[in-house]
Amino acid sequence: MDIDTVRKTAFAMPLTSPAYPPGPYRFINREFFIITYRTDPARLRAMVPEPLEVPEPLVSYEFIRMADSTGFGDYTESGQVIPVTFEGKPGTYTLAMYLDDHPPLAGGREMWGFPKKLATPRLQTSKDTLLGTLDYGPVRVATGTMGYKHKELDLAAQQQRLARPNFLLKIIPHVDGRTARICELSRNTMEDIVMKGAWTGPASLELAHHALAPVADLPVLEIVEARHLIADLTLGMGEVVFDYLAK
């Protein structure tokens, strides 16, 4: 294969059989279980990189079921997302996500900079309870519960919240194994959102300590709200808003 062909065909690795296809990435009946809680403000601020700002000491713990996604297939994801502001405008910062499928893990890290690790999240309905769990190896590190569809939420308001920009700290190491080749803050949004349902109810969240899945480093002090959402949406491509290596 000549150099010109490599340049023209290179998208992702392996060159001749990429781990994931080019976008757009459309999700049908994407199901969210989001528990927002109050946490320790000093610990939270220590984990959020400038120039993002933390308006309140809040964390959203998410369980997301994606049974029908373009190119990525059928998978589940779980992790912590932090409400932030950038240049005075509201958004979210994804701290860490854990999922059970390689293509979105590889694509998420390589394209946008999603901080993904391989684990075993689950989101299901158990009788009258919406139940989310996260296992890292044999260890249960997160359990979320909510009363199933106790009260409907306003769909337009929830769509606006989903449409807020999300920020990611994309880090790609140099081949020397010591320094970062890429270290940048990226921004992406969910697009073409079609809300199909939104509910709330009484909720609980239990986090356990684990050295490699440190979700409990942001302790649960108070549950603020819980939401169960179902929507079709497209995960938009990103843009770089801050380059930490620029001089």
Curated annotation (Swiss-Prot):
Short name of one Pfam family: ADC
Q: EC number(s) of the enzyme?
A: 4.1.1.4
Full protein name:
Acetoacetate decarboxylase
Keywords of this protein's UniProt record, alphabetized? Decarboxylase, Lyase, Plasmid, Schiff base
Supply the InterPro entries for this chain: Acetoacetate_decarboxylase (IPR010451), Acetoacetate_decarboxylase_bac (IPR023653), ADC_dom_sf (IPR023375)
* Family membership noted in the UniProt record: Belongs to the ADC family.
User: What does the UniProt function comment say about this protein?
Assistant: Catalyzes the conversion of acetoacetate to acetone and carbon dioxide.
Which reactions fall under this protein's catalytic activity? acetoacetate + H(+) = acetone + CO2
Q: Which EC class is the enzyme in? A: lyase
Gene3D superfamilies, A to Z: Acetoacetate decarboxylase-like
> Do you know which NCBIfam families this protein is assigned to?
PRK02265.1
Native organism is Ralstonia nicotianae (strain ATCC BAA-1114 / GMI1000)
HAMAP family for this protein: ADC
MF terms in GO: acetoacetate decarboxylase activity
- Active-site feature positions: K116 (schiff-base intermediate with acetoacetate)
